[in-house]
Regions:
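Glycine-rich loops and low-complexity Gly/Arg-rich segments
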Residues: 56-60, 115-118, 133-136
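Leloir-type glycosyltransferase catalytic cores
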Residues: 1-28, 43-44, 119-170
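Catalytic donor nucleotide-activated moiety binding site of glycosyltransferases and closely related
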Residues: 34-39, 44-81
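Short loop/turn segments at secondary-structure transitions that flank enzyme active sites
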Residues: 37-39, 114-117
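Donor nucleotide-activated moiety binding/catalytic core segment of transferases
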Residues: 63-108, 113-115
């Protein structure tokens, strides 16, 4: 559920949204794909998610697909900001980087386990003007902040009360 939440829990760096970059004429040359780790895919019984996605996405775009796996310990990935700078869209199963992409104005296609799900487009929207319609990014980000809690908020009941409100409404 997407609720109206104040920005009192939203960090300052997430309050400054960059201009929206969606639409078929946006010059991003790649579709940046953020697959989950193997244990994560296995836990959700989605072990073939990346393979299915790569075969399906080509029906909707001719752009290059850039796959950014989670960096392994001791391994280095290209800088996130440089990869995002060339992205026409970001596709994520459940990565928090999808929120960063939204903040930076890049459209996201997210699956149900992703914090950016409420601002998600569909694969069919790639290379169409549907991506020009900016989601309510501020509302989505503020809402996400009410799904994360500090230890004392579990002790004082705020986490439970807020979780029930998130699930069932007030």
């Amino acid at each position: 559920r997407l609720l109206d939440r104040p920005n009192d829990r939203t960090p300052e760096e997430l309050r400054h949204l960059q201009p929206w970059k969606g639409g078929k004429n946006w010059g991003g040359e790649n579709i940046l794909i953020l697959p989950p780790s193997l244990p994560y895919m296995d836990a959700f019984e989605e072990i073939n998610w990346l393979n299915k996605l790569c075969h399906t996405i080509n029906e909707f775009t001719g752009r290059n697909l850039v796959i950014r796996p989670k960096p392994a310990k001791g391994k280095k990935a290209p800088p996130w900001d440089s990869q995002l700078a060339t992205a026409a869209a970001v596709v994520s199963f459940g990565s928090n980087l999808a929120i960063d992409a939204m903040v930076k104005g890049v459209p996201t296609i997210s699956y149900k386990y992703c914090p950016a799900f409420f601002g998600s487009f569909k694969l069919e929207d790639l290379d169409t003007d549907a991506l020009m319609e900016e989601p309510d990014r501020e509302k989505i980000i503020n809402n996400c902040m009410y799904h994360s809690f500090h230890k004392h908020e579990f002790n004082n009941g705020f986490a439970w009360e807020t979780s029930m409100e998130n699930a069932y409404g007030s």
